[in-house]
Curated annotation (Swiss-Prot):
Its EC number is 2.7.8.26. This is Adenosylcobinamide-GDP ribazoletransferase. The chain crosses the membrane at residues 30-50, 52-72, 109-129, 132-152, 175-195, 198-218, 237-257. Belongs to the CobS family. Its main location: membrane. One of its GO terms (cellular component) is plasma membrane. It comes from Clostridioides difficile (strain 630) (Peptoclostridium difficile). GO terms for molecular function: adenosylcobinamide-GDP ribazoletransferase activity; cobalamin 5'-phosphate synthase activity. Pathway: Cofactor biosynthesis; adenosylcobalamin biosynthesis; adenosylcobalamin from cob(II)yrinate a,c-diamide: step 7/7.
């Protein structure tokens, strides 16, 4: 529980007034990444539910998307912008890493943030218009499960950085544990809270495979650029994985079936 509280305080702006001290093995809290996502998902769902009572679906979709940014303090959206500024500057590795540390927003950063947020709003709008707000609960959870792969048997090209707390530290047992409890939470909520049929559960679980495949391809692409992973890339991976999840859900559940 101590490590879960620590990682929740680290990755979100949820006001938790608990002093649980320092943990010399803080890296082990990475196993709770999906659980942090689950908390974010529940909060986003509740905010979405209230928003839909007060506003039209389009406004509610904007509020839901904004909620995800505010709950995390913009931590991951900042990583998205920094990553796109650096990786698509088409400079050498050292220059890319330097650009990634620069707090100023470039054109690539602004475009990436704008398009990702707009696409999220669009897909969330379609999803909630189909009376499927429950889908939002699993988006942050599955995205953070996927991004754990970016910390599995990886290296970082930087000597310092927040991402160094986790990159290369994930063990096989930690990954398996996270996968198992994620599957259980998705199954329990889908079947026993929302009483959805088995076919819907199978489709939602399929999003985990899709996100994993995306992250593997994303990691290969990043390695070609800077020979490793940084904290910004972890944040970028979360934002893009959430978008991939929404696209998958929209195409598989609402468009083709």
């Amino acid at each position: 529980m101590k490590r879960f509280i620590l990682i929740l305080q680290f990755l979100t702006r949820i006001p938790i007034k608990l002093n649980v001290g320092f943990d010399d093995e803080f890296y082990k809290s990475i196993v709770y990444f999906p659980l942090v996502g689950f908390v974010i998902g529940i909060l986003s769902y509740l905010i979405g539910w209230i928003s839909m009572l007060l506003f039209e679906p389009f406004i509610a979709s904007i509020i839901i998307t904004l909620a995800g940014v505010l709950i995390t303090g913009g931590l991951h959206i900042d990583g998205l912008g920094d990553t796109f500024d650096a990786i698509y500057s088409y400079r050498d590795k050292e220059k890319m890493l330097e650009i990634m540390k620069d707090s100023r927003l470039g054109t690539n950063s602004l475009l990436a943030i704008m398009f990702v947020l707009l696409l999220k709003v669009g897909f969330v709008y379609d999803i909630i218009s189909n009376n499927s707000l429950w889908v939002i609960i699993f988006m942050p959870m599955i995205a953070r499960l996927g991004v754990m792969l970016l910390t599995y048997k990886t290296v970082t090209p930087r000597e310092k950085g927040m991402g160094n707390l986790f990159i290369g530290k994930l063990t096989t047992s930690m990954l398996i544990t996270a996968i198992i409890y994620t599957l259980l939470i998705v199954a329990l909520i889908t079947k026993f809270i929302f009483l959805l049929p088995n076919i819907v559960l199978i489709k939602v679980l399929g999003s985990i495979i899709v996100v994993f495949v995306f992250i593997i391809l994303f990691k290969k692409h990043i390695y070609k650029k800077i020979d490793g992973v940084t904290g910004d890339i972890l944040g970028c991976g979360i934002e893009l994985s959430e978008l991939v999840y929404l696209i998958y859900i929209y195409l598989l559940i609402f468009m083709f079936f």
